[in-house]
Amino acid sequence: MPPKKQQEVVKVQWGRPGNNLKTGIVGMPNVGKSTFFRAITKSVLGNPANYPYATIDPEEAKVAVPDERFDWLCEAYKPKSRVPAFLTVFDIAGLTKGASTGVGLGNAFLSHVRAVDAIYQVVRAFDDAEIIHVEGDVDPIRDLSIIVDELLIKDAEFVEKHLEGLRKITSRGANTLEMKAKKEEQAIIEKVYQYLTETKQPIRKGDWSNREVEIINSLYLLTAKPVIYLVNMSERDFLRQKNKYLPKIKKWIDENSPGDTLIPMSVAFEERLTNFTEEEAIEECKKLNTKSMLPKIIVTGYNALNLINYFTCGEDEVRSWTIRKGTKAPQAAGVIHTDFEKAFVVGEIMHYQDLFDYKTENACRAAGKYLTKGKEYVMESGDIAHWKAGKR
């Protein structure tokens, strides 16, 4: 008798559950954060002032997630309404050295970082005497180190306070199931505190078990959030694809935050493109033999949150719905309306690639590509769904 196949252990995902997740734009003052926010949202919110705290309260915007599949479906169905997937982006006030102790807008800044689920970290890699750097000169490695150090200090302080509370509870000695759970939590958080204070590495870089990740997720630690590094160069450097700071920044990320994404870009160039129509912007990029990095930045942020999308399609509307990786069919249906989840019967599912290949829904059915899926079906990015629900 052949040995039983071991069931694959599903890795617990970092971060909050749910699909309404947010990215925050983080960096030192005057590195291009607010200008980047204005470019990514194509909104005119007034020029950011040339001083450290131009953005006192976080600005929020929803940006459409570029998706060629969605564009094709809209062309195929020609619907009256087209609703893409969206990514929520916050512009957060600049961090300064000492933020963890309340310097500048430190406490407000760190609370805003805690409220987001992923980070776009804008790193200044351009020289400009007219744009003051809060530290006096341009040094991307120093800036990177300041930010990670401030986040690590705040995480360690938060974990230490949490541990103090747990120790008081577990010292009472009661041998209940609740107490056993608290002792397990304490042991994990002791390990987390040791990791933060001894390795000086972001918590997301540690090797953690599923149970440990669950406990860490409950703490909303700053260094548990995925980070995408946006290296803001001058337009000249971006167009010639050469920058004196870039190799040093890449080396720092490889050594201190291995595996994190680095995207070279020019905020000045991206902002200039927003002054054009779409056709003019495309023509300008062709003329300069380059392209906007905003689509890549948005998609990378969306993916960093472990988000995927599925579609509902018809003559009235083509819509992209955001869900987390690993979402099952009833919960995916529930994103449209909670009744669809509660009274879920089945989903009729075909995949975008099959519709693209076979061209019509009828051809997909004839080829056996339009399938009925039940409650245990795990959604895939690019699924096209028609939900059937019963009476509650």
Curated annotation (Swiss-Prot):
Task: Please list the residue ranges annotated as the OBG-type G domain.
Answer: 21-285
Q: What cofactor does this protein call for?
A: Mg(2+)
The principal localisation class reads cytoplasm
Q: Where does ATP bind?
A: N30, V31, G32, K33, S34, T35, M233
Listed GO MF terms: ATP binding; ATP hydrolysis activity; GTP binding; metal ion binding; ribosomal large subunit binding
Cytoplasm in keyword set: yes
Which residue range or ranges hold the TGS domain?
A: 306-389
Q: Which GO terms describe its cellular component?
A: cytoplasm; cytosol; nucleus
Q: Where in the cell is it found?
A: Cytoplasm; Nucleus
Positions that bind Mg(2+): S34, T55
UniProt keyword list: ATP-binding, Cytoplasm, Hydrolase, Magnesium, Metal-binding, Nucleotide-binding, Nucleus
Task performed by this protein:
Hydrolyzes ATP, and can also hydrolyze GTP with lower efficiency. Has lower affinity for GTP. Negatively regulates the G2/M transition in the cell cycle.
Q: How does it assemble?
A: Monomer.
Similarity remark: Belongs to the TRAFAC class OBG-HflX-like GTPase superfamily. OBG GTPase family. YchF/OLA1 subfamily.
Which NCBIfam families does its entry note? redox-regulated ATPase YchF
The record's section on PANTHER family has: OBG GTPASE FAMILY, OBG-LIKE ATPASE 1
Protein name as catalogued = Obg-like ATPase 1
Q: Which source organism does the UniProt entry give?
A: Schizosaccharomyces pombe (strain 972 / ATCC 24843)
